[in-house]
Amino acid sequence: MGWKTLDDMDLAGKVVLVRVDVNVPMENGEVTDATRIEKIVPTVEDILKKGGKPVLLAHFGRPKGKVVDEMSLRLVLPALQNALPGTKVSFAADCVGPEPEQAVAAMLEGEVLLLENTRFHAGEEKNDPELAAAMAKLGQVYVNDAFSAAHRAHASTEGLARLLPSAAGRLMEAELKALEAALGHPERPVVAVVGGAKVSTKLDLLGNLVGRVDHLVIGGGMANTFLVAQGIEVGKSLAERDMADTAREILSKAKAAGCTIHLPLDVVVAREFKAGAANETVETAACPADAMILDAGPKTVAALSEVFASAKTLIWNGPLGAFEIEPFDAATNAAALQVAQLTKAGQLISVAGGGDTVAALNKAGAAEGFSYISTAGGAFLEWMEGKELPGVAALTV
């Protein structure tokens, strides 16, 4: 799959419409975590260096096609200005029509313009061709730097890309390269770690992975469903008993594809789910009837450590236990730190993504050691499921 990048585009003197993700958390009208804003800086700076005029398009929250003051991108302007010191950043109170047209016409070289929330228009989420055409009128080139919104065919992510010469921004480019290295043409053996609470939410993911990876590690509440499918009692643990047949199908599909599935060998159980709860480690088949499985045990971690050490590529989505509460974060922490160590030693390419996953790796202090951490959430999951992402497909040459 090929796509153009900023290096392929002549941007001098051109207005460049850049789709970015600045959907940041806010409290009392102030940005509490500016990570997503900071990540778009390399793209904006590169466009400025090439003599282009960056005009930023983004959504914020879910206003459902109406103007909602608390979801105005005007609130993000101070944090964006902080991320681009020395660059004048202006704001236009719409993303189409006379106001942005005048603001674009008034731009000087070296300035940046942020447009209002694209989702204030109902046509954005419907991928309305008229809205996309009105956006396209504002610029000469389109750059998509919002991989996190690439799984949605919206006017500003898909429709617009088909109307102007288009390229991937630096963040999008990094994400696509990392994902291509992990699942497109990976170095083998490939290990996928899939955790989280429910099999039902990750069915497509598991079905796609068993045909593409050499080892599939299943953790979290999801592992309990697979244990139940094998006739193992899990006490009061979270398990989707109605998914047992589906779990058995995944196991047989994996066997046919030559993919080894790894389930917990021992588990940490407790009678209550709270920090510091009295707990014990037991063999997987020996979970007491009145207890619940909250983490994988040390034998499991030791076995996984051998699997990781033999791997060349690793993809991670979802924790191995109830990582939010100590001591049930032990397996996730130990596994994450080992992956980070192998990656730093040059033995492993490691890519992780999904909200809980990023939180778990940060908590373990391991995130910095991974080759690539995707902040994309839904788009990362759909990519792992093998689905075409409209925002990426629209950039493909």
UniProtKB/Swiss-Prot annotation:
The keyword Transferase belongs to this UniProt entry's keyword annotation: yes
Pfam family membership, one: PGK
Highest taxon of the lineage: Bacteria
Cell compartments where the protein resides: Cytoplasm
Entry's Gene Ontology cellular component terms: cytosol
Annotated residues for binding of substrate: 21-23, 36, 59-62, 119, 152
Gene Ontology MF annotations: ADP binding; ATP binding; phosphoglycerate kinase activity
GO biological process: gluconeogenesis; glycolytic process
Catalysed reactions, as listed in the record: (2R)-3-phosphoglycerate + ATP = (2R)-3-phospho-glyceroyl phosphate + ADP
Alphabetical list of InterPro entries matching this protein: Phosphoglycerate_kinase (IPR001576), Phosphoglycerate_kinase_CS (IPR015911), Phosphoglycerate_kinase_N (IPR015824), Phosphoglycerate_kinase_sf (IPR036043)
Protein EC: 2.7.2.3
Primary location class: cytoplasm
Binding site for ATP: 202, 324, 354-357
Pathway assigned in UniProt: Carbohydrate degradation; glycolysis; pyruvate from D-glyceraldehyde 3-phosphate: step 2/5
Keyword line: ATP-binding, Cytoplasm, Glycolysis, Kinase, Nucleotide-binding, Transferase
Keyword Disulfide bond appears in the UniProt entry: no
Subunit structure, interactors included: Monomer.
Family named by the database record: Belongs to the phosphoglycerate kinase family.
Annotated PANTHER family: PHOSPHOGLYCERATE KINASE (PTHR11406), PHOSPHOGLYCERATE KINASE 1, CHLOROPLASTIC-RELATED (PTHR11406:SF23)
Protein name: Phosphoglycerate kinase
Native source organism of the sequence: Cereibacter sphaeroides (strain ATCC 17023 / DSM 158 / JCM 6121 / CCUG 31486 / LMG 2827 / NBRC 12203 / NCIMB 8253 / ATH 2.4.1.) (Rhodobacter sphaeroides)
Name of the gene encoding the protein in the UniProt record: pgk
